[in-house]
Amino acid sequence: MANGNFKLSQLLNVDEMSAEQRSHFFDLMLTKPDCEIGQMMQRVVVDKVDDMIRERKTKDPVIVHEVLSQKEQNKLMEIYPEFNIVFKDDKNMVHGFAAAERKLQALLLLDRVPALQEVDDIGGQWSFWVTRGEKRIHSCCPNLDIRDDQREISRQIFLTAIGDQARSGKRQMSENELWMYDQFRKNIAAPNAVRCNNTYQGCTCRGFSDGKKKGAQYAIALHSLYDFKLKDLMATMVEKKTKVVHAAMLFAPESMLVDEGPLPSVDGYYMKKNGKIYFGFEKDPSFSYIHDWEEYKKYLLGKPVSYQGNVFYFEPWQVRGDTMLFSIYRIAGVPRRSLSSQEYYRRIYISRWENMVVVPIFDLVESTRELVKKDLFVEKQFMDKCLDYIARLSDQQLTISNVKSYLSSNNWVLFINGAAVKNKQSVDSRDLQLLAQTLLVKEQVARPVMRELREAILTETKPITSLTDVLGLISRKLWKQFANKIAVGGFVGMVGTLIGFYPKKVLTWAKDTPNGPELCYENSHKTKVIVFLSVVYAIGGITLMRRDIRDGLVKKLCDMFDIKRGAHVLDVENPCRYYEINDFFSSLYSASESGETVLPDLSEVKAKSDKLLQQKKEIADEFLSAKFSNYSGSSVRTSPPSVVGSSRSGLGLLLEDSNVLTQARVGVSRKVDDEEIMEQFLSGLIDTEAEIDEVVSAFSAECERGETSGTKVLCKPLTPPGFENVLPAVKPLVSKGKTVKRVDYFQVMGGERLPKRPVVSGDNSVDARREFLYYLDAERVAQNDEIMSLYRDYSRGVIRTGGQNYPHGLGVWDVEMKNWCIRPVVTEHAYVFQPDKRMDDWSGYLEVAVWERGMLVNDFAVERMSDYVIVCDQTYLCNNRLILDNLSALDLGPVNCSFELVDGVPGCGKSTMIVNSANPCVDVVLSTGRAATDDLIERFASKGFPCKLKRRVKTVDSFLMHCVDGSLTGDVLHFDEALMAHAGMVYFCAQIAGAKRCICQGDQNQISFKPRVSQVDLRFSSLVGKFDIVTEKRETYRSPADVAAVLNKYYTGDVRTHNATANSMTVRKIVSKEQVSLKPGAQYITFLQSEKKELVNLLALRKVAAKVSTVHESQGETFKDVVLVRTKPTDDSIARGREYLIVALSRHTQSLVYETVKEDDVSKEIRESAALTKAALARFFVTETVLXRFRSRFDVFRHHEGPCAVPDSGTITDLEMWYDALFPGNSLRDSSLDGYLVATTDCNLRLDNVTIKSGNWKDKFAEKETFLKPVIRTAMPDKRKTTQLESLLALQKRNQAAPDLQENVHATVLIEETMKKLKSVVYDVGKIRADPIVNRAQMERWWRNQSTAVQAKVVADVRELHEIDYSSYMYMIKSDVKPKTDLTPQFEYSALQTVVYHEKLINSLFGPIFKEINERKLDAMQPHFVFNTRMTSSDLNDRVKFLNTEAAYDFVEIDMSKFDKSANRFHLQLQLEIYRLFGLDEWAAFLWEVSHTQTTVRDIQNGMMAHIWYQQKSGDADTYNANSDRTLCALLSELPLEKAVMVTYGGDDSLIAFPRGTQFVDPCPKLATKWNFECKIFKYDVPMFCGKFLLKTSSCYEFVPDPVKVLTKLGKKSIKDVQHLAEIYISLNDSNRALGNYMVVSKLSESVSDRYLYKGDSVHALCALWKHIKSFTALCTLFRDENDKELNPAKVDWKKAQRAVSNFYDW
């Protein structure tokens, strides 16, 4: 490892380990090398060493001869990781590290220069260039002082040594080295092509040109510009025509603020004094470097500079250690007028002052006893701890000894969150004593001020009780006014008068004081002030002045007499983190520059301008005359308004607004009326692309042949390259013999229905195209429905202005005021929606949007009477509407074309095959993506095809929008990634292109066409199985061998690779998105759009430049290195399917790192491939022979039977061992301090639309409560304190982590379909009651059920209905953490559950209404639908007893995550329809809709406010029932519940029993795309519902609580006392009585094994659990009191316990 120059932190992430983990790691490596884990660690280290050596071998070596310590070698590799550094350690130097660093910096500068260009090295490293054979570099090495002479001698000696080594055969020299060495043979000190001893400005080694010295276009300067005046450098660059100088200098930005500081990377320092700046090395007696400060500052600030008509621009591009690498560009020909007023701004950051504070410390000069102040830089964390400690000391404890003791003990080690952390910036012991004095005095000064503050507050709050108090206040107020008036006017008018009162005192003082008259004259204004304030003080005005006026006078006097005292002297401040530069370019121009040298001659400019305009006019006339026969043009020339005199020059010319160039305009004489010529002109311009290209090309050729001056014509396209024109293309009709009028697909109508499915014809090409048109129309209708819903909500006031984070990117533009009512997040939408208010129904039109600087500049139609327009996500791009418009005019007969498929694995060269086989001049080439199309164009261009490639190679969308007229045809159509498109789209492309043969490139195992409308069922979307010829390609050029091993499982035939990389994939487990490794320039890939959004925000926040795309977006792309990221723990059945796995793992050529929060199929595949040996991977290379591989599969059957009595056996140890076997490691995790650590350490949160209130919130951690101690250790979380940080964490992880719907949904149609199914399947229509809810008895019953506190709050609130803000909610978090039965508690910090609830008055309004509605729903529900509401365990068992134990069922569980947070507008509208079905009034429905649309939540306890849209509020009047309705509706929509035997549901839990063999489609994809639910479907041997197993006994089905969850909760640490434990015992004993039946116990054992993947038997542990549950005495043995003593079961009031336990007791 030492020879390879690797650090241990490079081999393993040791820096990320804790101290304990690091210790264990080294112990295993060193003491137990033969154990399994020790051998595994050795293999990891060896593999990483091999990988690093292999990677290092690919880089060119850089030999460092200087002798460096291991620490310096590590530092060098850390600062310059791109180099393969080889340390020879054979050359001792004074500053070895600095010399080695200069070599690497020189190579970095040289890398900025093109490889074949000559370079001038200013100050030069010529001996280094000789050793590398860089013959293109000429070094200018002037000997300006003795140090330079010494260096030159050293270099000559080094060169001589190289020659000696070459002659003795010890060194091999390349041809370039020999050539460079030959330059020195005659005279080693003479100038030559390699180097000279001249300055850069005086060097003539490259000769002369036009009497001026020649130089290279590129120059480098390595630490040589310090003494090079900037003006001289600019003059030399102008003379030698050098374009750019790449330079390196020591960079000390803090020198602008502080005179002395360190340079830690080189172990050096800087010091500034007497107009010079000194650079030196610490602990080094050699001479320092002295440079002019003003010149150094010019390079440090890097301001743009103008010189001799050139602008010199500074570009700092990197900081390495303490060295700044920058470039100076010479920009010629910049028009000064355009720069004269431009402002620029930048910051120079000072990284070394990060996390530091500046503390003033004081000392006494021994000789004069004068107090001296200086600033001390201290680590902020250290200072915060010290200030916090001192503030908590009492007045008696506040002594210097206590302060010194605490500072000394924490100077080297800080205890943070219970762990010892080394203080990196420790304070010097001498300064520490002075720091203690400062902190002590600061606290002593602060405490009286705080006491005065408290007294002032008490005085202000003291009531006035007597007439004396009133008169005293009035008198004091009048005196204050008089004193303030004197103070304000005294300095100007009254001083002269008042000084006359004391003339004798002033004269006496001047006479008796030495030099009195002189002092009185010099300080006359000070004397007047003293006299004036004496008068004011004499009349008592000083104490009566207003506080701000008195403070202002004090400040002026202190400034006047240079007095610096007060508490502010002790303030601890943050150091400056950056130095700001803010200037104008106009300051760069010197008035001394002459106009003749800077600007061209004005007469010459005028002549050239006239000639250019005349040429343009003639070309335009000729072109228009050839195009239009009735056109004739003439030029009308106007003279300039004034003649510009030649006497003006320089700045005078720049600052005067004059017309320099001649103006000209083109006039047109028409032979016909204006409308006719305009119509004809436009019809000629908007022609087919081919016709325009031919005319322009022919005309350009004629102009080039006939124009003697060589002027060329540049015709710019209307659409910039790389962007497709999204506006409607005017096209001729395609269908012959009929006139097609464009259907208005841009009209938006309310109440539109989804189109009917087309009739099946039997011809696949016809059916696929019809279906594609049907799909496009359905997408249009769904988008119209979403647009109309936003329009309705805004017009009805449900969506209001002033909110944030509006749904669907909503923006509302006020047409009259021309401003945004609601500003969208993004602009530049292609279309805007303009409502049409002339009609009674909801309607409008999509109009083409015209943008200017984020504002709409359309002239909207006045006749529609709309005062606002709307933009949203659905109006951003409307390409599919244009495509639908174009394709609807085509005939849909059978397509006469043969279709071929090249079915290839990822990276097999499908695009290369197109480039090699297609001729774009005669074939049509299409691709589904813009990037892939550009790549094809670039590769075709490299082969030199003579045709217009952008006309022949297009994206599919561009082809369907612009080429339906037949302008692009060919016998052969090449279609890249054809399987990603709808089959109808492929058929349309073949029809339009007139192709006889369509060659499709694709992969049947990768991502196919995905519809964006979830409600359409597509039957003809795929071409798989419809191809005439299928050619398989199973050799990949992209994927490494381990990826080929994964792909081989999913493809027919053997997958082989040409990539020489064997192992390329690794898995990195992360806890959250915060731990994603952020690498500049990396390619990140995510599965979901929501994950992409999170990652983009994270990269933007950390200012890391990298690309992010989803797996779907990256299909067809190739990257060298990929970071695949999963930040969502929930499983998405669509985005995490097999096809996504294949695409995700096959995008890279070198490496892939999968960073995931959860183990899944992707990580499993990666780990399995990583476990393959080299021999196993060898078979996947193309060169290896194919090896046969056989696998065996076994089916395992289990059957247990034999009931008997449950024995009274088992111990606490049995329970603990069983739990540890189920969840290894959970019992070792102590979470008691988790909440405290989170509250007291830094936490980075990204929250949108949240307002927090800072303040001294109650220290909840000071509250001490005593609880019983559990004997069993489980992962049952501790109670947490509900702090502000916990509130924000819960908001981020729950309310702001809701998924976004990615597809279009026609909400109106889906609601109608769902309501229809509810009536036919769930409810008995005859029992549905829809009469108005006016039941007074129901209201009174609800009122009686409320507590007296709630009744008092409602009665005290006297607001009317219109005064209540229904959209405002309270927000709180629960202190109890939901226990988890998996391994996540070991590494995951769970967020607390949030409760969002209305105030009591609103609940009193809606509570009785929803109670009545829910009773009506239960009365009308079919009997086999079991709604788990207000049911005990026995009630639930009674409802499922009808299930036949002899019948076979398929039980289906649907697990939904983030359920109530996934609600959107559609869910709200559906819920309102259900309420209306059971009698809800419209006024109440409107109030409920308003209260759930645009809402504000406030956490008053913790000072937080947030904005939330549509989410189901977890504490409103109908939370549980509304969630249950949504679950039922979603399952009803996507599953055949009409076939179900039993449907049990409640909240987000559900269990459905189907007859065995019932066929249905996995509902999870539709639940995700239509209902916005992230879910998983389970089919276990034993189903579970609401934490209870549904067990089949000999006589019936029975729900039994999950014993694992029961045992987990027995580790609860918040049970107060034995009385509380008795209440828990009653509840436990009642709900777990089934454990007394051994038949249940045996079934439970199987259930646990099936659910938790437990391989052992659980009967013994279940027996032990029942033993401790059935007896309260045994239960008491599971806990100890606060003194760690056994509990006394006799100390229980059982009557009180029985009263406390209700039917729904939750412990």
UniProtKB/Swiss-Prot annotation:
The replicase large subunit is translated as a fusion protein by episodic readthrough of a termination codon. When readthrough of the terminator codon TGA occurs between the codons for 1187-Lys and 1189-Arg, this results in the addition of the RdRp region. Gene3D superfamilies: P-loop containing nucleotide triphosphate hydrolases. Keywords: ATP-binding, Coiled coil, Helicase, Hydrolase, Methyltransferase, Nucleotide-binding, Nucleotidyltransferase, RNA-binding, RNA-directed RNA polymerase, Transferase, Viral RNA replication. Residues 872-1033 form the (+)RNA virus helicase ATP-binding domain. One of its GO terms (biological process) is viral RNA genome replication. Residues 65-425 are annotated as: Methyltransferase. It holds the Pfam family Viral_helicase1. This is Replicase large subunit.
